[in-house]
Amino acid sequence: MVLNINSFYKNCRGEFMRAVFIYHKNNQRMEKFYKNLLNEPDFCRICDDCYNCRGNWTFKNNVKNIVIEEVYEEFVDNPYDYLPELPEGDICIAQLHEDLLYELPLLLKEKGYKALIVPSETPHDLSLALRRDLKRVCSNYNIEFENPKPFCSLEKKEGNEYINKFIDYFKIGKPELEIEVENGLIKDVKVKISAPCGETYYIAKRLKGKAIDDLKEEIANAHHNYPCLASMEMDKELGDTILHKAGYIAFEVVEKALKK
């Protein structure tokens, strides 16, 4: 499969960032990450009293998704039977069969990508061994690499020039909020950075008008109702479920905003 979309992009690094999502068919988590950045009118329909709390922005001219067929084999002899030709870009966000992931950095290097992000939403999305290999291979190609577990744990790091720009540009990663309190009640909440799935906008809406003492229950309910799509399976590395880790992050960012 060849995607002839390079002319769609401006080659204006620093002023125009290009992100490409690549994942297998039926990957609902990656589909949600991608569609969050499109911000189409029907993306979020969770509230009956919708007043478009997300706003009228879109990154439809900055993002593309490449959906490839599912791989059922445990080992893939020729990953290039599945991997398509990639468009040029800056950042690649990928969830793929591990044999395909291992070959991906070379393709990214050839197309001028500066970073690879492989989010883990289940304990099986990326093995620790392949994480080490990808980090090494990407380093050899001068490609930044991160494996956030979950995606909403992605935050800026020293040395990650392009991933830091990705967070600033698309306003996704570890959430950041600005909260205004009046007489013990939440008067207003502004989303500075959203979780990649878009949940932060829903949490912000749910918090408005609530008493500070009631926030813990409100955040927990919002996290499960949105819903968070992270796995409920125990992750050995975390010693907890990734769903719970995402929930802890949601609590943490609200507490941090209240202290400012």
Curated annotation (Swiss-Prot):
EC number assigned by the record: 2.1.1.-
- Please tell me which top-level EC class this enzyme sits in: transferase
Pathway per its UniProt entry is: Pyrimidine metabolism; dTTP biosynthesis
Question: A single Gene Ontology molecular function, please?
Answer: thymidylate synthase activity
Q: What keyword terms does UniProt attach to this protein?
A: Methyltransferase, Nucleotide biosynthesis, Transferase
**Record Pfam families:** DUF166
Asked if Membrane is a keyword of the record, the answer is no
InterPro entries registered for this protein in UniProt: DUF166
Biological process according to GO: dTMP biosynthetic process; dTTP biosynthetic process; methylation
This protein's record includes keyword Methyltransferase: yes
Q: What does this protein do?
A: Is able to catalyze the biosynthesis of dTMP using dUMP, tetrahydrofolate and formaldehyde in vitro, i.e. a reaction equivalent to that catalyzed by bacterial thymidylate synthases (EC 2.1.1.45). However, M.jannaschii like most methanogenic Archaea lacks folates, thus the physiological cosubstrate is unknown but is likely one of the non-methylated methanopterin biosynthetic intermediates.
- Give the protein name, as stated in the record: Thymidylate synthase
Q: Which organism is it from?
A: Methanocaldococcus jannaschii (strain ATCC 43067 / DSM 2661 / JAL-1 / JCM 10045 / NBRC 100440)
